[in-house]
């Protein structure tokens, strides 16, 4: 075990359509099926964050929210830049895009992964790892300080996997 490793003392559960980043060490957890999560990390400052999106892209600027991959990734890159990150120091990881028994969901899953790759490439951000596709959902725990992810692959996603808190800060 690395004696210099810092164990994050803060945790955040990331819902679909949200972006979270922090200069403090955090463990960010999320759950994805056909949706995609992208972790972004600045190798110099150790600034880390994650987003989760449901749909690949929104062409119109009206109603552009972080549920769309092109919007969420572009906005998170902007957030990192505003914190002083240089694009050359940014590294990313992509998770999700699982297939299902529904043809429409399969198409969305493939487009979600394709959008994540293309938008990151457009911004000049290197993808250092991917865990995408397949038929299993994923529970992800991302360490923002060390840029490490722990991935649990699951057959089914329960409602409590998506919403582990009862709204009053207590786990359900």
From Swiss-Prot:
What the entry lists under InterPro entries is as follows: CheD-like_sf (IPR038592), Chemorcpt_Glu_NH3ase_CheD (IPR005659), Cytotoxic_necrot_fac-like_cat (IPR011324)
- What Pfam families would the database entry show? CheD
**Could you list the residue ranges forming a coiled coil in this record?**
none
GO biological process, any: chemotaxis
Top-level taxon of origin: Bacteria
According to the UniProt record, what class of enzyme is this?
hydrolase
Q: Which reaction does this enzyme catalyse, per its entry? A: L-glutaminyl-[protein] + H2O = L-glutamyl-[protein] + NH4(+)
* MF GO annotations: protein-glutamine glutaminase activity
Give the UniProt family note: Belongs to the CheD family.
Q: What biological function has been recorded for the protein in this entry?
A: Probably deamidates glutamine residues to glutamate on methyl-accepting chemotaxis receptors (MCPs), playing an important role in chemotaxis.
Q: What is this protein called?
A: Probable chemoreceptor glutamine deamidase CheD 2
Species of provenance: Syntrophus aciditrophicus (strain SB)
- Gene coding for it: cheD2
